[in-house]
């Protein structure tokens, strides 16, 4: 599964590569002017790739991370 930024802002990741995730777990946060939105896992799995560095700028639709099979 590929996880994308919902809108432009600064991304902060809360997981590491190799970490197991569960449905609804908060993976990252995207922060824009006075707005902070959690990015949650759509299903169980293992983080296989983090495509952005912490506190980097993203635009809506940018790849944040990938989740593989659980």
Label the model's feature ranges.
Residues 5-6, 11-18, 49-53:
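Short histidine-centered loop motifs in beta-beta connectors
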Residues 48-49, 66-69:
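Short alpha-helical linear motifs
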Residues 1-11, 26-44, 69:
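Short beta-strand-turn/beta-hairpin segments enriched in glycine/proline and small hydrophobics
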Residues 44-51, 56-60:
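Short, charge-rich amphipathic interface segments used for partner binding and complex assembly
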